[in-house]
Amino acid sequence: MINHADIENIIGCKTLVTDRMQRAIEDWYDAAINGLPLDKNPETLTLDLPALICAELARLTTLELEATVEGSDRADWINTRLQRVLTPRKRRIFTVALALGSGIWKPYQSGNKLGISFANATRYFPVAHDVEGSLTEGVFIDTIQEDDSYYHRLEWMHVLERRQDLRDAELAQLEDYDLAAPTQFPCIKVVNLAFRSATQDSLGSPEDLSIRPEWDEIEPVAYLTGQETLPVGYFVTPIVNSVDPDSELGAAVFEPARRQIIDADEQYTRLDWEYEGGELAVDTDEKFLKPSATGQQLSKAQALKEYGVPPEAIDHTAPHHRERLFHGINVNTGITDSTPFYQVFSPALRDGSYLTGLNQYLRNVESHAGLSFGVISQVADVEKTATEIVNSKQKLYATVSDLQAALEDALRGLINALDYWADHIPGAPGKGKLNIAFKWDDSIILDRLTEMAQWQQEVSMGLRSKAEYRMHFFGEDEETATQAVQAIQQEAGAADILKGVLDNGDG
């Protein structure tokens, strides 16, 4: 990750990224993306719980997600581009946003087309927000690697409500490019700068934008008029940022369970050592492992004949798995050549206790990460009361509901950004009505059969109508549901009449 201080030197002001937050983002990246243990101990084996937690919450949050924009030709144009973001393949990037605390969907113009890029927390530096929390200034980084060089393009976007909002560094840049200050407000000043470096995490030396053919037609400075916030979809995780409570940036969704994840990894390391330390072995004097007086390696046939194992299994210098079957002990045992000595090492494993302990550690992780029991632990191993089960599911429901609300807010921001860019793309439809609808899966806390049973009871009590029941569970509109209920009632009435006739006839 490029140091925030280097970005601040270029734009002439502080970003919202502090030293503490940058270290945290890099730490989250190492844990969730690179799979390194949170305790930084190379001897610790990791269960990859940060990645697992992020992937599972991303799946539950976007499960059956439907977002549509309708109502006009402009709405259809926006909806087509929005659906590209919502494809299952694209949803995977939401996992990265959960892992690093935030992410931004940013439309960009490429000729007569409009693309949408995603920047995770290592690829953008927020500078300022307005009172409603919308981003008003930020720096985005686009990196291209070729051979041993890294080419970085910085896109600095700043909302200006009046000329006085221009800082000294910005005025100096305008003079460097011999450009006048903007005359229409509000507007967004967009500055593009190119750099070349030998490493991915440093800016390197300034270059012209023409150094890359992809950037050759990009203007160094441009103005986007009529916009009071950056045209982006800005997602921030809705959890307490325990790393820096005063920061506007989000935290990784697994950060509240950091200590518990470390405990679980340590317990998993103990369990692995229990299995490795308990591997079958045979202890014997080293001289009985020497294949000959000259120390020459036995042939495969000799080894199989004398020991019943391949020659590598009696090499006491290779201590792994099958190759550690024989242990050479260099001690004076007093054993003669005619009386071989060996002792089988086959201890009883204590994995049951370790597994029980590990499962409890995993439950602690679930509790602190806002998950329900059984997402990563084994629920069958622990007896729980009905109240514990309900409370656990409610915790997950609250976590996912908060994430869905934050994601919906970001997607609405993206829709507004697409609506803004439609005014600047040749051939895009003119202004029109935008009917935005979101549909989320709400069956996390209550399974389908339980919910149906509850509704059926409410229908029998007269609290709901049969038409409401069909509309909710069968997806019918009110007219279709009402007609279906009437048809069923008529059929039931006809059946009653027929039964009465048959009963009278029998009498």
Task: Specify the residue positions occupied by each region the protein language model found.
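Extended, helix-rich architectural segments
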Residues: 1-151, 163-166, 301, 379, ...
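Conserved aromatic-histidine-acidic binding/catalytic patches
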Residues: 13-16, 29, 45, 58-62, ...
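Flexible coil/linker segments and helix-coil junctions enriched in charged and small residues
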Residues: 32-36, 75, 163-182, 292-315
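C-terminal helix-loop subdomains that flank or include functional centers
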Residues: 303-341, 345, 349-507
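Short amphipathic alpha-helical segments
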Residues: 74, 81-90, 97, 256, ...
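Extended, regular secondary-structure scaffolds
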Residues: 99, 104-251
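Extended, charged amphipathic alpha-helical segments
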Residues: 204-391
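Alpha-helix initiation and N-capping motif
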Residues: 4, 71-75, 87-91, 254-257, ...
